[in-house]
């Protein structure tokens, strides 16, 4: 059993709940508290050598992942004028605590919305991990390249910071009606992640997701969605692109350090009441393909890149309870 990484995909799916600038919202308190439970199921797709291709499913199970995140947000009105485009500006200060079976990670974030369709965000997090029944939360690749060696919890830390800008638009802002909400959201994020005490180009693992190295990276997502006044409140498609900036982030120059991972995920969001919402994603993703066959991902950083391998990656669910 191996936990894998739920990247920001689920968080993006749930941020739809805030993507309603065209609607009237009554602010009762500047505080907002929520708990989000994430779960992902990964079927098995064996690796296939060669140029760009699709890898079919070869098994029912490859891994599971789960985590719980508590969040507290304080909203400060920052109106820039009396015009309706300017008078709703806000500054959000958020603290989070993420807990998984193999890690714990607090985070701080700041978000400024100067205009209804523009959002700027930045933040950072620091966490640590441990081994639980063979599930490695934080580890370094062994010298022989065949296993990961556990790192000491609270002796080594995973550190990440990010800065991003988001453009969002809802046709309901200009066309009134319950059924007029076609939505678009695009985000570009610059981020850095590292393990303290680990040298650059050294391969490491965090939350059972391996083949990582320290470095500056970028993440983009594009959401196209339609909102409805139903329990099934939103359907759409999420497209994500992620890569390292540095072409020499990995020691092996043939691994293609700046490979762009692409994910395309149909999504649905259910809003059951003012407290409970559920996002569901079915993710198709790309990963590196190599010139030679291999069985395990731990072998990959020593191989030669040859193209894209597309596969069905996971089904992910995220339940949010807002107090």
Annotate each language-model stretch with its function.
Residues 79-84, 116-120, 173-184, 229-237, ...:
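Repeated loop/turn-to-beta-strand initiation elements of outer-membrane beta-barrel proteins
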């Amino acid at each position: 059993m191996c936990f894998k990484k739920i990247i920001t995909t689920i968080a993006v799916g749930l941020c739809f709940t805030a993507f309603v600038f065209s609607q009237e919202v009554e602010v009762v308190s500047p505080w907002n508290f929520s708990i989000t439970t994430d779960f992902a199921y990964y079927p098995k797709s064996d690796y296939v050598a060669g140029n760009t291709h699709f890898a079919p499913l070869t098994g029912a199970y490859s891994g599971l992942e789960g985590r719980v995140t508590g969040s507290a947000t304080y909203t400060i009105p920052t109106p820039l004028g009396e015009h309706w485009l300017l008078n709703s500006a806000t500054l959000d200060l958020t603290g989070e605590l993420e807990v998984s079976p193999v890690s714990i990670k607090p985070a701080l974030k700041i978000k400024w919305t100067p205009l209804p369709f523009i959002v700027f965000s930045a933040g950072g997090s620091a966490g640590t991990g441990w081994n639980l029944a063979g599930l490695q939360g934080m580890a370094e690749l062994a010298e022989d390249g065949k296993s990961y060696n556990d790192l000491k919890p609270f002796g080594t830390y995973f550190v990440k910071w990010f800065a991003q800008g988001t453009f969002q638009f809802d046709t309901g802002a200009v066309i009134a009606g319950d059924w007029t909400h076609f939505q678009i959201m695009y985000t570009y994020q610059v981020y850095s992640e590292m393990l303290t005490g680990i040298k650059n180009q050294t391969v490491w693992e965090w939350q059972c997701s391996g083949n990582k190295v320290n470095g500056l990276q970028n993440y983009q997502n594009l959401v196209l969605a339609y909102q409805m006044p139903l329990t099934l409140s939103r359907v759409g498609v999420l497209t994500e692109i992620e890569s390292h900036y540095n072409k020499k982030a990995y020691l092996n120059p043939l691994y293609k350090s700046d490979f762009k991972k692409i994910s395309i995920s149909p999504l649905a969001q259910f809003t059951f009441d003012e407290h409970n919402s559920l996002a569901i994603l079915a993710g198709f993703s790309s990963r590196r393909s190599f010139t030679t066959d291999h069985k395990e991902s731990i072998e990959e950083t020593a191989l030669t890149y040859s193209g894209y391998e597309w596969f069905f990656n996971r089904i992910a669910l995220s339940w949010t309870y807002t107090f």
